[in-house]
Amino acid sequence: MTQQSPYSAAMAEQRHQEWLRFVELLKQSYAEDLHIPLLNLMLTPDEREALGTRVRIIEELLRGEMSQRELKNELGAGIATITRGSNSLKSAPVELRQWLDQVLLKEA
């Protein structure tokens, strides 16, 4: 019996399909106003906190007023986490960056 490599194309496709299934479930939960209970079910408190921190990282990177080191100190996040956020933001589609600018940086 051959075990499938965790890095095989078939496994990658399966994981991608599982991700898309979750995204569709989340979309449906918003339509039915069940998104908060669903996310509470699916994510641990630490995972929810990490997502909130990632939003703050992206927001501050878009704002561009703090260095990555200052951001690390402000948020208590690891420099590797901030660097990954920065690299992801650099490779994000222009439309997504523009949308994030509008949504995250709008005046409160």
From Swiss-Prot:
It holds the Pfam family Trp_repressor. It comes from Salmonella arizonae (strain ATCC BAA-731 / CDC346-86 / RSK2980). Residues 68-91 bind DNA. One of its GO terms (biological process) is negative regulation of DNA-templated transcription. GO terms for cellular component: cytoplasm. The gene is trpR. Homodimer. Belongs to the TrpR family. It is found in: Cytoplasm. This is Trp operon repressor. This protein is an aporepressor. When complexed with L-tryptophan it binds the operator region of the trp operon (5'-ACTAGT-'3') and prevents the initiation of transcription. The complex also regulates trp repressor biosynthesis by binding to its regulatory region. GO terms for molecular function: DNA-binding transcription factor activity; sequence-specific DNA binding. The keyword Oxidoreductase does not apply. Keywords: Cytoplasm, DNA-binding, Repressor, Transcription, Transcription regulation.
